[in-house]
Amino acid sequence: MLMSIVLFAIGLVLLIKGGDWFVDGATGIAKRFNLPDIVVGATVVSIGTTLPEVMVSTTGALQGSGAMAYGNAIGSIICNTALIAAISIVCNPGPVNTKSMKTPAIFFFASAGLYCLASYVLGTFPRWMGFVMLSIFVVYMVLTVRNGMKNPDEAEHEEEEEGKQRTLLMELALLVVGAAVIAVGADLLVEHGQIIAIGLGVPETVVALLFVALGTSLPELVTTITSLRSGHASLGVGNVIGANVFNLVLVSGVAVSLAPFDVPCENFLLDTGLNMSLVFEIPVMLGVMSLMIFPTLASKKLARWQGLLLLGIYIAFCVCQFVL
C-alpha cells in the first residue's frame, strides 16, 4: 500500500501543477483576443481551477467508482467552507460586500436542492440530471459575467504575470500539456485512492471526502491565502462560494452526464443501517454553507466565531469518518 500512497501523492501534485499550466495557457490565449479581465477570470480561470475536481469525479464515474465522484464533490464543498473559508474568516473577520454573495448563494442552494432530490428521492444521478446541472452552470456563468461587467470595481483583478511574454505556441502547449497532466493525475488519484481505501478498510467515499477533496481544494486555499495577504478576506470567501457552486453543477454535471451513478451505499452510521451520505455528509455540507452565508448576509460582516465554529465542525467531520 506504500507505493499506492506515493502514487496517490504524485497524482495530487500532477493535478495541481497541471491545473496551473492549463490556467496559464488558457488565460494567455483568452487575453490575446482582448477579452475583459472579468470575463477571463469568471470563465477561463474559474473553470481551470475546478478542472482537477472535474477530472477526478469524471474518471471515478467512468471507472465505475460513483463513490469517488460523489464523495469528491461533497468533500470539496465541506473542505472549501469549513477549512479554507474558515481560516480566512478567523484571520481577518470584518465587514463584507454581501451583494456579491447573493447570486452564488442562491445558485448554490438551488443546486443543492437538485442534489438532494437525486440523493433522497431518486437514489441515483440519472443522465438527464447531469444535463440540468450543466444548464444551471451556463446560466450562472452568464449572470456572473454580466454582473462583473456592470460592477467592474467588485471584480477580482489578477496581477499581470511575466508569462505575458509567452508566444501563442507556448500558451497552446501549456493548455494541452496541462490538460494531459491533469488527466494522468486524476487517473492515479482514483486508481490508488481505491487501493488505499481497501488497505485501510474504509469505504472509497471516505478517501474521496477527506484526502481527494483536500488535495483538489488546494487551488482555493492558495487563492484564499493570497486574498488574506492583500487584505481582501471577503474576496477569498466569495471565491469559495463560487467554487462550491462549480462543484455541484460543473463537477457533478460533467461526471453524471458522461457516466450516471447511484448514491453510494457502502458507509453506514454505526450499526443503524443508515446511509452516512444521507444522514451525515449532505447535512454537514448544507450546514457549513448555511453557517457561513446566512449570518453574514444578516449582519453584513464575517465574524470570527463563524470561522472558529466551522473549523471545529471540520475537525469533528474528519474524526467521525473513521469513528462512526
Language model features with spans:
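Hydrophobic alpha-helical segments, chiefly the membrane-spanning helices
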Residues: 1-324
